[in-house]
UniProtKB/Swiss-Prot annotation:
Heptamer of 7 subunits arranged in a ring. Interacts with the chaperonin GroEL. It comes from Ruegeria sp. (strain TM1040). PROSITE patterns: CHAPERONINS_CPN10 (PS00681). It is found in: Cytoplasm. This is Co-chaperonin GroES. It comes from the Bacteria.
Length: 95
């Protein structure tokens, strides 16, 4: 199943978090937090003004992004857990 976001929504794949600390300690799965970084998998066309004019998206497929801890809604596409969120939930693009 393919999923294309509508309007100003973005489909994001979380990046894997580190399994070791800087000191070399291994972090068990039960203690890991979900990462707040990800890669944009798909984008909608953008939001529309009241006049109908299209507001272009600031992110594109393949961008590495930073988002809020509680942002988005988890969706499963082809057995893979992804996040669907509004573009406004994205805090920035990692360059």
């Amino acid at each position: 199943m393919a999923l294309k976001p509508l309007h100003d929504r973005v489909l994001v794949r979380r990046t894997e978090s580190e399994e070791k600390t800087a000191g070399g300690l291994i972090i068990p799965d039960s203690a890991k937090e979900k990462p707040s970084e990800g890669v944009v998998v798909a984008c909608g066309e953008g939001a529309r003004k009241d006049s109908g004019e299209l507001i272009a998206m600031a992110v594109k497929e393949g961008d590495n992004i930073l988002f809020g801890k509680w942002s988005g809604t988890e969706v499963t596409v082809d057995g893979e857990e992804l996040l669907m969120m509004k573009e406004s939930d994205i805090m920035g693009v990692i360059v």
